[in-house]
């Protein structure tokens, strides 16, 4: 775990500028920082800019996101903050002249208690293993190259694919079949690089086809084919 802000890696310059203040917010204590930033803070495999907070594993003590309290505290630190409400349990807040997006989301269904993978001030992330399951679930909903790249980096860090598939199935409430997830993982044509990805300064230069080949070898090694 980092001891000071100089040890924080994996953020774009705009996000780095506000990260210390965001990490000190009281309103994020019950939330988890998920997504690519939750991974980049632990791996520094690329830069990430969005801060995606999720309310996971809580229902009885705090059934909904407290929009008023969250926005009030953020605006106390960032008076220029602008909000965008996407739904009762999902809203965005833009800070640092709109260059940094904070999202706050509560999944419709409760998520079992998460383990803490990384912590700094009031901010915490899931473990890399849990993030892999989340990423596999995500690519069943959208196809963006950075997610494919993130999955490769997590597998290369020895996260378990079987366990991640099981967790992704759990997140989908078992509506997405394991066979569908494996097929998506072996479909590099769905994941095309774009200019935004190159702006994230990936530490590894790899193509979608090379990622597919790596995943295929991982599956073969575990007797999946």
Language-model segments: which ranges?
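Compositionally biased terminal segments of proteins
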Residues: 1-225
